[in-house]
Amino acid sequence: MKVIEKILEAAGDGRTAFSFEYFPPKTEEGVENLFERMDRMVAHGPSFCDITWGAGGSTADLTLEIANRMQNMVCVETMMHLTCTNMPVEKIDHALETIKSNGIQNVLALRGDPPHGQDKFVQVEGGFACALDLVQHIRAKYGDYFGITVAGYPEAHPDAIQGEGGATLEAYSNDLAYLKRKVDAGADLIVTQLFYDTDIFLKFVNDCRQIGITCPIVPGIMPINNYKGFLRMTGFCKTKIPSEITAALDPIKDNEEAVRQYGIHLGTEMCKKILATGIKTLHLYTLNMDKSAIGILMNLGLIEESKVSRPLPWRPATNVFRVKEDVRPIFWANRPKSYLKRTLGWDQYPHGRWGDSRNPSYGALTDHQFTRPRGRGKKLQEEWAVPLKSVEDISERFTNFCQGKLTSSPWSELDGLQPETKIIDDQLVNINQKGFLTINSQPAVNGEKSDSPTVGWGGPGGYVYQKAYLEFFCAKEKLDQLIEKIKAFPSLTYIAVNKDGETFSNISPNAVNAVTWGVFPGKEIIQPTVVDHASFMVWKDEAFEIWTRGWGCMFPEGDSSRELLEKVQKTYYLVSLVDNDYVQGDLFAAFKI
C-alpha cells in the first residue's frame, strides 16, 4: 500500500499518523539489534517506516536487504530512500525492480549527499543530476506503481544556506519553486528535513500552500538524544538552533540522560504545536534508538505502552502481494517470521476462509528457520543450555518458562509468554509439571470486547471469540492416558503425531477448525486462526527439528544433555488439542490424570 494512501486514510478517520526512520548499521550485529528494536517499535502501529540509502550510496545492497526484511518479515509498510549519488540509471532501475519484486511500493527520491571525501555533488556518468530527474524517471518507467516522497527543506536546502544568516530570500524562494517542480513531476508526499524552530516549519508549510503545493507535508522530528550528536547533525544540515534551546542544553550538556529527557520534552512540545494547526502526521528520525521517539509519542497520547492495538491476532503482512491475507494456521503463532519465510511466493494467500485459497506448498526447512538474532541466541544459551539429566529436568525448563522465570523459548521468536496466556498460566504450569511440554496455547474467550488489552484485536466496536487451544509434546504413555480420558469430553478434538509421522486423531484429515474469530459492525465474521490437519503435518517437522537444531545444538556432540534431547525428539508426540466448547468447556479437565 502506498504511504500517501495510509496517511490520507488516517486523516479521514481523524487519527494522527506517525512513522519512524532508520539507517543501515555498520555491523551484522548492529543490523540484528536494529531488527529487534524495530520489532518492538512497530508493535505500536506506525503508518510506515523508512530506511536510508547511505552517504554516497555506500550502503545500497544493505539498504535493499533491510527494506525487504522490513516489508516482509517485520511486516511494516516500508519506504526506501533512493539517491542519485554514484548511481547510473541501470543501478537505479535494479534497485527499483528489486523492491518492486519484494512487494514494496514506496520510495523517497533524493539527490543524495556528495560521495565520501568530496565536498560537492557530482553527477555520475549515466546517472541523474537531481531528485527531480529521479522523480521523472520513476513516473515515466513505472507509472503509478510507486508512491513517491520527496524532501522539503523548511530553511532551504543546506547548499543554499550561507553562514549563520540562513538562506537569502531568493535562495529560499528558488528552493520552494524547485520543490513544486518535484511535486508536479509526480511526487505525492513531502517529508521535511529536521528543524528545531517550529515557527519556521509552519511558515514553510504556508509558503508551500501559497505557491500551489497541495500534497501532505510531514514534519521530520529528530529528538535530541545526546549533545554532541545534536551539534554534529545540526551543523551538517545547517539547522537553526533557537537561543532558548541552547540555553536549556548548556547546563546539562555533559549529562546524557538529562539531555535525552529534555529532548523528549522539546520534541513533545514541538509536536503539540504542529498538531494544533491541523497537521495529522509526524515522522520521527530515530537514529536507530527507540526511547526518545516512543517517549514523545506516549507524551502525546498517540500510543500506550500497555495497550498495543492489533488489527489481527498476528501482525498482518504489508507486502503488496499478500496484503489481503487474513487467515493463518495457529501452529506458527509464536514463530511468525518462520511462517512468512515458508509461505513466501505463494500465488494466493488465504482471505476470508482458509479452504478457499490455501496453497499447500510450504517452503522447505532451511537454516533460516533456526538462526536467531545474536541477542536472542545469547539469552537462549543462558536460559536453556543447562545440564539435563532426566526428562524431569526438561520439564522444569518448560515449567519455568510458563512461570515467567525464563523469558525465551527455542520454540518462540517472541519475548516471554503473551498477555492472553497469563490467563491460564497456573494450568499451564500444572500440566508442564506432569510432563506435557507446552509450546503454544490460548484461553477460551466468549465475546470479549475487541479492544480488550489482553485478548482484543481488530479495533474497537467488535467482539472476539476463541476456542481454548493447547499444543504440547508428551511421551507415548502419557498420550495413551490422555486419549482415553478425552473420550469422556466430546468437545475435545486432537491430532497427535511423532517425528516419523505416526498419527492419532479424532478428526478428519480434511477438517479445518476456526479457533479464533471476531464479529465487527458492518463486516463479515473474520476467522484469522485455524487448526488445519495438513498444515499441522508440515509444522510438526519444524517443531521436532527444534529439539536438536534449536536446543540440542547448544551442547557439544556426544554430550549427555544433547543425547537426552535427541531421544525425546525421536520418542515423543506433538499434540494439537482444541476444546470446541468455548462457553462452558474445560480443556484442562482432561489432564487430571
Swiss-Prot record:
The keyword Lipoprotein does not apply. It is an enzyme of class 1 (oxidoreductase). SUPFAM superfamilies: FAD-linked oxidoreductase. One of its GO terms (biological process) is methionine biosynthetic process. Pfam families: MTHFR (PF02219), MTHFR_C (PF21895). The keyword Transmembrane helix does not apply. The active site is at 21 (proton donor/acceptor). FAD binds at residues 52-53, 81, 111-113, 153, 157-160, 175, 182. InterPro entries: FAD-linked_oxidoreductase-like, Fadh2_euk, Mehydrof_redctse-like, MTHFR_C. Belongs to the methylenetetrahydrofolate reductase family. This is Methylenetetrahydrofolate reductase (NADH) 1. It comes from Zea mays.
